[in-house]
Amino acid sequence: MAIKKFSSLLLPLLMVLALVVLPIISGRTQEHPCQDYRLGCKSRDVCNAKCLSLGYVKGGDCVTFAFPICCCKINFGFQDDSPISSPIFTD
């Protein structure tokens, strides 16, 4: 009897857990969208210059996960000129 009651509560509990945990996990991966990275980040200026020289228009930044890395920011230039993301509407 107790096993049936436990198993009937287990599925809804797992579903609620999945609904709570999945957005947290997916949100954490988008905090620092790196396209390219180099191990060891000594300064932001050096990292930014390195990423700009590699062709990343938005440059780069030092990010620490388990150790500091130089994270080159993803180029989403086409989204900057999108009329949906622009707060100014012109006719």
From Swiss-Prot:
GO cellular component terms given for this protein: extracellular region
Biological processes annotated in GO: defense response to fungus; killing of cells of another organism
Disulfide partners: 34-72, 41-62, 47-70, 51-71
Record localization: Secreted
Primary localization: secreted
Source organism superkingdom: Eukaryota
Keywords: Antimicrobial, Disulfide bond, Fungicide, Plant defense, Secreted, Signal
Family: Belongs to the DEFL family.
Record-given protein name: Defensin-like protein 82
Organism: Arabidopsis thaliana
